[in-house]
């Protein structure tokens, strides 16, 4: 099998041309788990097959390290853009990529015949709990905190974009209580094509020493998330800077997560803790 190993900000995947390397559907999960193993395989956060498509320029068929399917990966789709251009599969610099029925649009920057940058329109965040999906009955006494945030928006200076977004949902999960492994946390739910739960850490915690490997799996499999969840642990430095660590469903801790970065900024804006433009430090 021919493959290409690529990463975006350390979020590494194994990329395979699905039109040339034909793997039976029933064997893909097994093959992905073998290839992703960092000791006995190639090693990566998962495998991405790049396939032909009737509705977009290409299809991204993404799998997590554990062999499960995933809907979207911000870093992964950027690498797909570079792959298809650098491998001569297209000469277009404006691309459409479909994954699980959802189309994203890419803009490629090319220098000396090679892609140097890829910009992706990740689309609008999904805040409706049922569509993330989240089961609000599994939270600890859901209080629709977002309604209080809306009613106090004029006094707190909540951004207009946050006010508009929260005004359009029936049940949003913003700063709601959740019990995980005996502890009580505040969580905000966002989907960027895949489900995310954003949790905030105190400023006095050393985020680099935070035991994400112990608590991450408990969030991932919590009953509030019927399709499991990617969990971002965020530390607000100031209104323009956030520290982030991420536990991805099916892959564990990863060095970066593009959809997670987007979801974290959205959540932090909704909570009134940062501006609509900020830098996330991984």
Region annotations inferred by a language model:
Residues 1-114, 197-282:
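A glycine-rich beta-to-alpha transition motif near the start of alpha/beta enzyme domains, typified by
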Residues 99-200:
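ATP-dependent small-molecule kinase catalytic core of the GHMP/sugar-kinase superfamily
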